[in-house]
Amino acid sequence: MTEKAVIFDLDGTLSDRRHRLHYLEGQKDWKNFFEQMYLDPPIKETFKKLFRHYHNNHKIIILTGRPEEFRDTTINWLKENNVETHMYKMFMRESKNYESDISLKRRIFETKLNRYSVIKAYEDNADLIKLWNEKNIEVEDCSLDL
């Protein structure tokens, strides 16, 4: 039987990145945008759902557009929010990969997540919500009102 899995986006879904969005206005400053992510407050409602899925024996997949070089920072942030490494599998953007989030996540889904039965996704990006709907995956829109 295929293992049931749930996909969680990170920025804007599990973490509230609003305090660093100003780095993406005008000339995009990705360096500072990513370097400040450790300050993101958790989005508690989404974390409750992650823990619920984990306790229901669903595989937790964190699928993020964050670059691989921020893996340790991301793992530490998750640990600070009581998500231990044994609780999830995380897929990140390869270093020097500049493809769109939708292209990245579609590729990872089709090449690395095909062994799972993905039953739900939590996402804040409208284009990715559409992608998961096209894949017949139930999606919860986690976008915050700005």
Model-inferred region functions:
Residues 28-30, 82-85, 113-114, 141-146:
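Short, surface-exposed linear patches
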Residues 2-99:
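Alpha-helical substrate-recognition element adjacent to the catalytic core
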Residues 101-111:
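Short loop-to-alpha-helix "cap/lid" segments that border enzyme active sites
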Residues 55-57, 113-116:
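A structural signal for short coil/turn segments at secondary-structure junctions
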Residues 109, 115-146:
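Acidic, Mg2+-coordinating phosphoryl-transfer loop and its flanking beta/alpha structural elements
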